[in-house]
Amino acid sequence: MATIGYIRVSTIDQNIDLQRNALTSANCDRIFEDRISGKIANRPGLKRALKYVNKGDTLVVWKLDRLGRSVKNLVALISELHERGAHFHSLTDSIDTSSAMGRFFFHVMSALAEMERELIVERTLAGLAAARAQGRLGGRPRAINKHEQEQISRLLEKGHPRQQLAIIFGIGVSTLYRYFPASRIKKRMN
């Protein structure tokens, strides 16, 4: 049962001594480090630390925000450790998932992360509904407006080639096929 430390500083200029001293005092057998922003998901030091952790081991950080910036990421990382039979310990936040209280705190964090996701979905849906009520549509603007659609439809019915119409209207041939499938034009011509 090893104790693995993880250090992260956001910039090369930041000093890691405070974190290293704390992890050394916590009797970490091995310490991994990153000098990279917590917003960056791809952290080589953290990846090596997680590979090194085995069942019964504990991953130790000086402070919770050294491991991740969002509750969602923290929950995912700690869940991964839990699934592998490993523990997590944050020294300054007094979180230790090897204890009942630490596991309870982790479950509260998980619930908060889920609630945060649900609130984001609710706000997004409410915003889209409000925009629709004001006549705004979401998504990319249409490539061609109604008037242009009517013009193109008439020209296609007269037999003008799609490639030529695409150049004239400044759109792709695939856009023309999306608006005017070949089967629809043939039906109109018959």
UniProtKB/Swiss-Prot annotation:
Keyword Ribosomal protein: no
Keywords: DNA integration, DNA invertase, DNA recombination, DNA-binding
Catalytic site positions: 10
Domain Resolvase/invertase-type recombinase catalytic residue range list: 2-135
GO biological process, one term: DNA integration
Record-linked Pfam families: HTH_7, Resolvase
Residues of the DNA-binding region: 162-181
Domain of life: Bacteria
GO molecular function: DNA binding; DNA strand exchange activity
Similarity comment: family membership: Belongs to the site-specific recombinase resolvase family.
Task of the protein: A DNA fragment of approximately 900 base pairs, adjacent to the fljB (H2) gene, which specifies the synthesis of phase-2 flagellin, can exist in either orientation with respect to fljB. The orientation of the inversion region controls expression of fljB. The hin gene occupies about two-thirds of the inversion region; it is required for the inversion of the fljB controlling region.
Name the record gives this protein: DNA-invertase hin
Organism phylogeny: Bacteria, Pseudomonadati, Pseudomonadota, Gammaproteobacteria, Enterobacterales
